[in-house]
UniProtKB/Swiss-Prot annotation:
Disulfide bonds: none annotated. Belongs to the histone H2A family. It comes from the Eukaryota. Variant histone H2A which replaces conventional H2A in a subset of nucleosomes. Nucleosomes wrap and compact DNA into chromatin, limiting DNA accessibility to the cellular machineries which require DNA as a template. Histones thereby play a central role in transcription regulation, DNA repair, DNA replication and chromosomal stability. DNA accessibility is regulated via a complex set of post-translational modifications of histones, also called histone code, and nucleosome remodeling. One of its GO terms (cellular component) is nucleosome. The [ST]-Q motif constitutes a recognition sequence for kinases from the PI3/PI4-kinase family. It is found in: Nucleus; Chromosome. This is Probable histone H2AXa. The lineage of its organism: Eukaryota, Viridiplantae, Streptophyta, Embryophyta, Tracheophyta. It comes from Oryza sativa subsp. japonica.
Length: 137
């Protein structure tokens, strides 16, 4: 009955490898660092154990969403590298992200191409003979 496992606390204690809170939650964003920022920022006197995990998950989701849309915009423009212009196009073409980041200016993002309907030429207005002048005199 004398096994090396049991024995009432005799022998060396087994050391376990440290597991980060990010890996426990299945996240890539750093839970510990966000917890440290929340505590240092004095947003509240105390910070719950689940708050940095939840915030990390939200930030990771938002980053993944923006990166996916920006990657699609880069691919549409036949580019391999995401630049600020692609992020701008991704954010402004997505209704929810555009509302969330409505007041945010993205450096070197440019503007969305937009021509008002009034300024566009009229579509097929009547006679339309082939080879006729574009304006009637």
């Amino acid at each position: 009955m004398s096994s090396s496992q049991g024995g009432g606390g005799r022998g060396k204690a087994k050391t376990t490898k440290a597991v980060s809170r990010s890996s426990k939650a299945g996240l890539q964003f750093p839970v510990g660092r966000i917890a440290r920022y929340l505590k240092a920022g004095k947003y509240a006197e105390r910070v719950g154990a689940g708050a940095p995990v939840y915030l990390s998950a939200v930030l990771e989701y938002l980053a993944a969403e923006v990166l996916e849309l920006a990657g699609n915009a880069a691919r549409d423009n036949k580019k391999n590298r995401i630049v600020p212009r692609h992020i701008q196009l991704a954010v402004r073409n997505d209704e929810e992200l555009s509302r969330l980041l409505g007041t945010v200016t993205i450096a070197a993002g440019g503007v969305l191409p937009n021509i008002q309907q009034v300024l566009l030429p009229k579509k097929g207005g009547g006679k339309g003979d082939i080879g006729s002048a574009s304006q009637e005199f």
